[in-house]
């Protein structure tokens, strides 16, 4: 494995899905998270604590996106991260033999074949690989689909226990939800993936 420095300055290891470690047990919330908690006053004068949304990281490469998910688990921030990926799905790259000039104008959300292949890719590859990289169980349920003349957006959510017992989650205060949005458009085969892991307070 080769190590390289990420934009944040930390060392990262090249992604190999066969060597991703499982997250066996939860740990206490990182102390650095306290800087993301703020207090707000409600209309009735009561103070409540609110966690700021996690900062968004943008990617244009599937392996880098998956590597980020793995690194967040290594850094114990798996329940507080936001990643956005814009990419050509592997089934498109295979069909055009990695030559973007060969992309056909019909390769977009208006093509039933494209949507079918994309849904297969999401369920059988993207979600599976994200789970492998995270090291914990992801059980996404489809919670909606919105189609407009220019876009199709699928929304998925996981509010489960991620493979940990309620007692272990309670011991460390680690309850979190996962949200996944996948969007394609009517102009080209570029796909956008938005992944959020946020604590449930």
From Swiss-Prot:
Subcellular location: Cell membrane
Topology within the bilayer: Peripheral membrane protein
Cellular component aspect of the GO annotation: plasma membrane
Example of a GO biological process term: energy reserve metabolic process
Keywords per UniProt: Cell membrane, Membrane
Ranges annotated as spanning the membrane: none
Coiled-coil stretches: none
Pfam entry (one): RGI1
Xref: InterPro entries: RGI1 (IPR022554), RGI1_sf (IPR038235)
Gene3D superfamilies: Respiratory growth induced protein 1
Cited function: Involved in the control of energetic metabolism and significantly contribute to cell fitness, especially under respiratory growth conditions.
Family the entry assigns: Belongs to the RGI1 family.
Protein name: Respiratory growth induced protein 1
Organism: Meyerozyma guilliermondii (strain ATCC 6260 / CBS 566 / DSM 6381 / JCM 1539 / NBRC 10279 / NRRL Y-324) (Yeast)
